[in-house]
């Protein structure tokens, strides 16, 4: 069983069960035993719809992409993706094999 890098994408103002989606993802990952996760807010981006979202457009406040990233065992990522699907969330994701380690170890 190898390690996996999972990257999920949402918008900064999207909510699920009253929480921001990226917060819900991080909390759910922690509850499933994933050792760490991070959320990153984009400076600009576009998705399947093709509309550009940039920090400079006032009318797009809250619409910037957020990436939530986890490095975990494959079974942990499988459990997270199954939980996301069971909750009815529709998120684009990228799953890739990963080699993990610690420097100086």
Task: Please name every model-derived segment.
Residues 1-105:
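Positively charged, small/polar-rich N-terminal and surface patches that mediate targeting and assembly
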